[in-house]
């Protein structure tokens, strides 16, 4: 199982909802680690401010992508209960992680 260190900061999301979003992100990143088998440690920072979300990551000490992944808060909220939205979010994070590791898209 991958070691995931997620730091999250929310400005407009209530605390309970923020914790649910944080857990959903951790679960998604763990799934990607198991599926891709390309990293064992992930340091991830997620920020939400005025409903704008950004995610940055360092995977096994590698961070070749300096631009944060912009995520849609509505998509993230839908991903908690909707498998289609969850799959879309997971794919966005998967592609971002490949850029972080320096892989071509």
Locate each region found by the language model:
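Negatively charged, low-complexity tracts enriched in Asp/Glu with abundant Ser/Thr
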Residues: 1-44, 82-84
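Intrinsically disordered, low-complexity regulatory segments enriched in Ser/Thr/Pro
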Residues: 2-13, 54-91
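Short, structured protein-protein interaction patches enriched in aromatics and acidic/basic residues
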Residues: 43-58
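C-terminal low-complexity, charged extensions that often adopt amphipathic alpha-helices
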Residues: 87-105
């Amino acid at each position: 199982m991958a070691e995931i260190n997620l730091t999250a900061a929310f400005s407009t999301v209530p605390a309970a909802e923020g914790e649910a979003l944080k857990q959903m992100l951790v679960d998604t990143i763990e799934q990607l680690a198991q599926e891709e088998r390309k990293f064992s440690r992930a340091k991830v920072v997620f920020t939400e401010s005025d409903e704008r979300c950004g995610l940055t990551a360092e995977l096994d000490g590698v961070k070749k992508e300096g631009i944060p992944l912009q995520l849609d808060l509505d998509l993230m909220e839908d991903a908690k209960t909707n498998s289609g939205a969850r799959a879309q979010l997971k794919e966005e994070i998967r592609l971002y992680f490949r850029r972080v590791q320096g892989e071509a898209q």
